[in-house]
Amino acid sequence: VTHDHDGAAEVADYLQTLGHRDIAVITGPADYRSAIERTQGFVGALAKRGIELPKARVIEAGYTFESGVAAAEKLLTSKKRPTAVFCENDEMAAGVYRVALRTGIQIPQQLSVVGYDDSPLASRLWPPLTSVRRDTRDTGRIAAAMLLQSGDAARPMASVRPHLVIRDSCQPPQ
């Protein structure tokens, strides 16, 4: 079991701690469990800190680079753009980087960006992307070991907690 809810809540806490209050989220597809958990975790953690996300700051996308570009165009070309964007995967975050570059918005000086999954792409973007790491190798290794150990017996649940990998894509808002 992965704890997408907790990973997204950690992002909300981090951005709020930096001083961001005008935050947007680019979600995955509404029918994906991971997107539901990430969105609930993120929005819930912000609400606990007194930050409500307007509907215009929550944009559903498709976990692709192209959908990240489309969502970022809506967010970053509006008169009042957010100071931070949480993307529920790194591909969509790369789409935000593309639009920021094209529109002259500097990351992180004018816009903080956080991704999810900590894919190899996260460390290759410039500046390197802050992202939530889900140790999928550990998850697979644990699951395989549990299958081998349990045979036909009831299988216990294993969980791997995500954690935020802080790189250079965030700073306090100007």
Regions found by a protein language model. Name each.
Residues V1-Q174:
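Bacterial carbohydrate/catabolite-sensing allosteric modules
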